Design a protein with these regions (language model features):
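Hydrophobic alpha-helical transmembrane segments
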Residues: 1-29
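Hydrophobic alpha-helical interface/terminus motif in multipass membrane transporters
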Residues: 3, 15-16, 20, 53, ...
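Hydrophobic alpha-helical transmembrane segments of multi-pass membrane transport proteins
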Residues: 7-12, 29-101, 128, 146-148, ...
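Membrane-interface elements of multi-pass transporters and channels
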Residues: 17-26, 53, 57, 100-109, ...
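Membrane-interfacial helix-loop-helix junctions in multi-pass membrane proteins
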Residues: 19-22, 103, 153-205
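Short alpha-helical transmembrane interface motifs in multi-pass membrane proteins
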Residues: 31-35, 43-47, 78-80, 108-116, ...
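Short amphipathic alpha-helical coupling elements at transmembrane boundaries
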Residues: 51-58, 64-68, 132-136, 146, ...
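Alpha-helical transmembrane segments and their short interhelical loops
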Residues: 73, 77-146, 150, 192-205
Length: 205
């Protein structure tokens, strides 16, 4: 879950970055890297809440063993949710460290990207657990990745500014949680406070 975004960041950041030096007042690799931080949190928490939680629930029967103790099923679900968000923070921290090692995001405000990663993890961990509850098998999760996560990855401003898209797509992007996460993270990486923080947090929650 960490290797893929790092590969994208290095390959596209240095490759396209040679032709597009700056985007939105940032080096392209820093612009892309911030998007990769948020999309990594999205994919990590989604994968954990779907594939890993499904395995623990159905294949390993871990949930069944836990609820035999004096623990409610609600507690197990909340624990899975928080664990998915925690893994999102781990992936966020890993990519953030790489960016800082490359000389980007060396500002105290960049540390606030970690709570943003946790919020992203809570959002997509919840989506993942809903899909988990509906899934008859692993193949079912492909629909969520193909129909929800991939379009969100492409339309939320990970690779290029949302402002470059047609007005209708810009309006649609404004409804996407990943776009609001990126709108929080990018200013922080530049050492600036984001605007419309309550709106972005409200969409994520």
């Amino acid at each position: 879950n960490v290797a893929d975004p790092l590969l994208y960041m290095v390959a596209l950041g240095f490759g396209i970055g040679a032709f597009v030096p700056e985007v939105g007042g940032m080096k392209y690799i820093a612009f892309l890297g911030t998007g990769m931080v948020c999309q990594s949190a999205m994919f990590t928490s989604s994968f954990e809440a779907m594939y890993s939680a499904f395995s623990r629930m159905h294949m390993q029967r871990t949930w069944e063993a836990i609820v035999n103790a004096p623990i409610a099923l609600d507690d197990v679900v909340v624990a899975e949710w928080v664990w998915a968000a925690s893994k999102a923070v781990i992936s966020t921290a890993a990519i953030l460290l790489v960016l800082m090692a490359l000389g980007y995001g060396r500002t105290p405000l960049a540390l606030w990207v970690l709570p943003v990663g946790f919020l992203v993890g809570l959002t997509f961990g919840a989506f993942g657990l809903v899909m988990n509850a509906l899934a008859p098998g692993y193949d079912f999760f492909t629909y969520f990745f193909t129909l929800v996560l991939t379009p969100m990855l492409l339309l939320s401003g990970v690779f290029f500014p949302v402002e470059q898209m047609p007005a209708a797509l810009q309006a649609a992007a404004g409804l996407l949680p990943l776009k609001h996460a990126i709108d929080l993270a990018r200013p922080l990486m530049r050492g600036q406070l984001p605007t419309s923080i309550p709106l972005h947090v409200a969409v994520l929650l």
